[in-house]
Amino acid sequence: MLGVIAFALVVVISGCAPVPGGEPSGDPTPSIASDTPTPTPEPTKPAVADLLLSPDGLGPLRVGETPPATDPALDILVYDPDYCAEIPEASSPGMWLANYPVEASGHRPFTAAFRNGADTLSVIAIFSPEIRTETGIHLGSTKDELLAAYPEGFASKLDNHGVSTVYSVAGTAGQLLIEVTADGMPGYWPADELNRVNLLTVIPADSNPFGVAGGDAYFWGECTGP
């Protein structure tokens, strides 16, 4: 019995012993705030895949407006005053160019056009599949993907001589034309290109929709264009 009592006392005493390190060791060392300001990130030109296409324009570009010119290293559209200087048929020695390299398709990611000598944008045509609409549509999207992306329908629908169908999405100052290859002329399109988006174009809201496939409207971005 005495052994049991002695054992109990040992347990109680050991349970009441202070835990090593439990006592405060003194005032904590004060932290020293850094006076070095957080560096501001340098502005950069958006990547092609970050340019959002809308019925009114592309990124900072808007149809009906003059392209913003802030910094040639940052602007997505820049003016080259001598780009067409050595081409006799050119309507002007200079041209506005997408500020990105030419891609494997032979085009820059997009092109912009000005009509009738105006200094405001009237056409923005997309040539890169990396550029997408807010709903995810891009060059190469299927017709089914397009119809699912716009369940409420389109402002208009145009049959382009059976070669393609042009769907119009209305904006405020502009409209987005989404051209989809069609099978109205059997054999015109390779099987893997049929029923797919083959051109995305932004034009002013008061312009009439049109089709490009099978026509000669690819003059946009060329020195001999209007």
Predicted segments with their positions:
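Short, surface-exposed linear segments at secondary-structure transitions and domain or protein termini
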Residues: 185-195
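Short aromatic loop motif centered on NTY/YTY
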Residues: 157-187
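C-terminal motif of bacterial Sec signal peptides marking the signal peptidase cleavage site
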Residues: 12-15
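Short helix/turn-capping signatures at newly exposed starts of structured segments
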Residues: 17-161, 193-226
